[in-house]
Amino acid sequence: MTSKNSIQKALYLAFERLQWSELRDSVPLTLSEQDLENLRGINEKISLSEVTDIYLPLSRLLNLIVKAKQQRGLVVDEFLGQKPSRSPYIISIAGSVAVGKSTTARILQALLRHWPEHPKVDLVTTDGFLYPLADLKRKGLLQRKGFPESYDMKMLVEFISAVKSGQPHVKAPIYSHVTYDRVKNQHQTVSQPDILILEGLNVLQTGLDSPVDTRRPFVSDFVDFSIYVDAEEPLLKQWYKERFLQFRSGAFSDKKSYFHHYSSLTDDEANTIAANIWDTINGPNLQLNIQPTRERAHLILQKGQDHLMSHVLMRK
C-alpha cells in the first residue's frame, strides 16, 4: 500500500520553515503590529516573524503566478483579436475548523493588495452559503452543519462562476457567527477584483466526492490556486476547545448569540461540551470530507504547536 509520505514526496516539494523563509527574496514587510492585531483570529498567536518567514514568500510566489496568468491572458486575447478580458484569479483556502484558515486568508489579502499587478483583492468565506438555519432544521441537518450537504452548492457555484466570467457586480450572502445563521437582506458585493480569495472547509471538493451528482461543476473547477492549512487532529481539537472557552466571554456573551446559553459554563463544562462537538461533528467532518482533499491542493501549510508553520509543501 502506498503511504501518505510517499504520495507527498511524489507530488510535492517539501520545505522546512527556514528553507521557505529564504525564498522571500527581499520582499518588504508591509504590515505593522497593529495591522496584524486586526487580522488575528481567536486564540491565534501569529507574529510579524511568522508573516515574514511564511506569508511574504507565499505572497511572492502568488504574485509571480498571477503575473504569468495575466500575461498568458493577454497572449490569448491577442491571438483571438479581442479586447483584453477581465477574469479574476481565484485562490481557495481549505482546512479544518480551528486551523486558522480565516487568519491565513486575511493576511494573504492584506499582503497581495500591495503588489501593483493586483491591488484589488477580495475575500469571501463560504460560511454565507450554508443553508439558512430554518432550512437546516427542516432538512434535519443541524448536526451536520459544515458537512458538504449543509451548503447551498448550487448558489455557491453560481456565485463563483459569475465572478470568474467577469460579471461586474456579484453578490455573496453574509453569515453571522452571533446568530449562527445567514444574515437576511445583506450581501457582500464582489466587483471584478484582480484576485478573489475563497475560504472554506470544503473548497477542494470535486465531483468524485459527491454522493449525488458527479457531473455538475464544483467550486474547485473554477479555482486557479489552492491552499490547504494542515495540522494534526489532536492539535486541532485542542485549539477548538481553547477557542470555545474564549468564546464564552466573547461571542457567546452577546444576548443575541445562538450560543448565549454557553456563556455561563464552567471550564470543565465547556471543555466537555467542546470535546463532544468535536468528536461528533468537526472531527468526523475532517476525517470524511476535508482531510481527504488535502493532496489536491497546490500548496500545503503545515502547522505545529502554537499555530506556528513548521513545513510548506508545494506542488511540483
Curated annotation (Swiss-Prot):
One of its GO terms (molecular function) is ATP binding. The keyword Calcium does not apply. InterPro entries: P-loop_NTPase (IPR027417), PanK (IPR004566), PRK/URK (IPR006083). CDD domains: PanK (cd02025). Its EC number is 2.7.1.33. It catalyses: (R)-pantothenate + ATP = (R)-4'-phosphopantothenate + ADP + H(+). It is found in: Cytoplasm. ATP binds at residues 95-102. The keyword Ribosomal protein does not apply. Keywords: ATP-binding, Coenzyme A biosynthesis, Cytoplasm, Kinase, Nucleotide-binding, Transferase. Its main location: cytoplasm. GO terms for biological process: coenzyme A biosynthetic process. Belongs to the prokaryotic pantothenate kinase family. PANTHER family: URIDINE KINASE. This is Pantothenate kinase. It comes from Shewanella baltica (strain OS155 / ATCC BAA-1091).
